[in-house]
Amino acid sequence: MPSLLSVKDLTIGFGKNKPTVDQVSFSVDAGETLALVGESGSGKTLSCRAILRILPNSADIRSGEIVLQSRGNDIDLARLSERKLRGIRGDRVSMIFQEPMRSLSPLHRIGHQISEVLTLHRDCSMAEAKQQVLAEFEHVGFNDPERAYRAYSFELSGGMQQRAMIAMATVAKPALLIADEPTTALDMTTQAQVLGLLKKLQAESGMALILVTHDLGVVANMADQVVVMNKGRVMESGSSNLVLGAPAHPYTKKLFQAAPVIPEFERPVEQPKAADFILSLRDVRKTYGAIQAVDGVNLSVPRGKVVAIVGESGSGKSTCARIALGAELANPGGHVFFKESPEADAIDVQSLSPAERNDFQRKAQMVFQDPHSSLSPRMQIIDALTEPLDIHSVGTVAERRDRAIELLEQVGLDSSMLRRYPNAFSGGQRQRLSIARALALRPLLLVCDEPTSALDVSVQAQILDLLEDIRDRLNLSYLFISHDLAVVARIADEVAVMRRGRVVEQASPELLMANPKHPYTRALIAAHPEPDIHRPINLETVALGAGDPESWPDAFRYTDGVAPPLIEYESNHLVRTHV
């Protein structure tokens, strides 16, 4: 029996340049999931966009076949007229994208946008379309379909936006769904729920799924067949059991080595708490109008150590980072203390004079999630690295240039790059440059806000290696912000898990992973996709911990919005619980 979709020797190029996708072949059967795996620039997204012929204007299909089995006929989508192709897009073949806000109009109600799919491809009235859309909303997990129908995209959370995109793509019951990094921009528990939803829809409808991803953990949980791509070519392909169980190509092995996993720790030997701290948040609260973003956070960073705050969007972790650096003020009664050395007196970051703040900013710096936030596209690298020195009047022009060269060497880059602009560098190189800029003033503390989340897995591993190396060589302390427990398990000495502005559990990563107590911590661990087909995501655990705090088990439940206290459940292990 022929495959539902067969792509053979597909070659795509831009202008007269060499091919960006070169002789790529793959196929997917009805009811099957095919994963296209690779890092940024591998050609996986371009290959899938070619199926629906939604390539960038300057790109064209140079050769190859894209054959779709449609109602008993073979249709070569690469050569189909635009008029006939419009009848297939959204009907027989649908696609969902990484960022739903780019696909959902903010000017039109969600229900009207999805109804349009049915009025275009089905002979039905708006009233009939609405009923089908409401049924699809309920199917994809909206608790109140009528409200979702009337909502605008910006009124929904990221997870709900992606559910709306899935509803739009599946409402016409396509034979093939292409999902391009559908969960990359989502929190861990939301990602797990969306992956579970896709599997459920596929099982019920029998549709085929092409899943584009860079995450081998997602592949292990979803795929029947795997195609690994790099630089526009297929490196390896086969069943998920074969490719994930015994990868043959060096590039596939490299992806596996770089994939973040939550280690299986033994219960650790008890360690004494460090008495000396460099940073300490005391009873920190922050409200924005009626929203309590941070509520009673107490957290200290021991000198020379890494303390991580883990949580999902809206947990308050980034607000804590900004308050720690004095970029935002905590509510009255909250304090942030900084100690330059064990012998020095602590200063309150929240009440510094302008001169004191200027001095503090030399000693505490931030590394951002997106290096574009800290590197001006109009500045050469030498200017970006010497600007902090110039602002704080450090050294002569020659000394600043020497410092810039030294900084590049510290982050593993070459001095020949000084006269380049940021757009000449890869994402990983730009993050190295951001770290170099943060180190320019020889700080004692780095606050790292999701420094690896925007990077491919192999580059992510390199940046974590760099941060560990710099910490050891320069005796730095880190406050490390992340949504990924696998990342912090690797780098942190202590982890605080936040949910809706409160710390719900705090311990060493070894203790937290070996003996998690809070349902939300367990949900974060369960939601992390492991690159192992024998360790699937536990959706029941995810649903239990990711729900509303008032629905948690009795020992952890909030009552009328009032949280249980954060107690020392055992030595060096804090849990927010009534028990």
What are these regions (language model features)?
Residues 128-147, 341-344, 399-416:
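Conserved ABC ATPase "signature" region
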Residues 171-175, 440-444:
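A short, proline-enriched helix->beta-strand linker immediately N-terminal to the Walker B motif
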Residues 3, 74, 146, 240-280, ...:
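Charged, flexible cofactor/metal-binding loops and thiol motifs
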Residues 225, 237, 494, 506:
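Short, glycine/charged-rich "phosphate-handling" switch motifs in NTP-dependent
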Residues 65-87, 125, 196, 337-359, ...:
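ABC ATPase NBD Q-loop/coupling interface
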